[in-house]
Amino acid sequence: MKSNKKSLRHFITTMLFILLLTFANNTFARDYYQIKVYNIKNAEQEAQIENYLKMAYIPAMHRAGFKTIGVFKPIADDPAAGTKIFVLIPLSKVSDIDLIEEKLSGDKELQTMGKAYFDASFDNAPYERIESILLKAFSGFPEMKIPELATPKSEQVFELRSYQSSTEKIGQKKVEMFNTGGEIDIFKKLNANPVFFGEVLLGKDMPNLMYMTSYKNVESNQQLWQAFGNDADWKVLSAKEEYKNTVSHIDKWLLHPTDYSDI
């Protein structure tokens, strides 16, 4: 009898440990993101990339189990208009990158629908270069959130920003400013509809972080930044000595989602 009770206690203890471990893993799990940037030089390349993404790549990603792929183009007034197309791919783990390559390489429909893209000649390439960026979500914003914007996609604005830092250590202070300093909370409070915040693990502008916010239109974006600059919490946070000079360069793009974007 004592042996049975001891075995039962051991079983219960083991199950509790497994449950707690599972809970901990789920609690601290963070998304990864791949951002692919197609650099283009003219309307012909833009049309080629859009046709490939809409008719071949996005459907293939859906078949591979990746259901939420964002595709964005700079708005007409953005300096990058007509020169870039951004593709945002949320990942649950880094190994998903290998899984995507494995799934897509065996997708015959992708090869058929994307034939013009894959078989493009050396003197008529559909793009100039492709840039790939890998990010890990901030602990203070571990999962991507798809905004609910009550306007047509043609009016919606997604702002993508990249903050570079002078050194890795200084860059970590800027990440800290978002995570525990309260900068993410300010964005939430002001209804900036954050999509993601992430630290760049691989990319050409490291050390840097990137994040995306969203708005129903251009005017809402402008109003947000005016309110942000005047916010009392931001004034206190930005005045802290430990966070000064944590950003050495900022890149920003105002983007519209395409009509076939999942975000």
Predicted regions and their residues:
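N-terminal secretory signal peptides that target proteins for export/translocation
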Residues: 1-9
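Intrinsic-disorder/low-complexity regions
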Residues: 3, 24-25
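Generic alpha-helix initiation/capping and coil-helix boundary signal
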Residues: 6-7, 17, 94
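Bacterial N-terminal signal peptides
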Residues: 12-23
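Short S/T/G/P-rich N-terminal loop/turn motif that feeds into the first structured element of a domain
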Residues: 26-111, 116, 120-234, 244-263
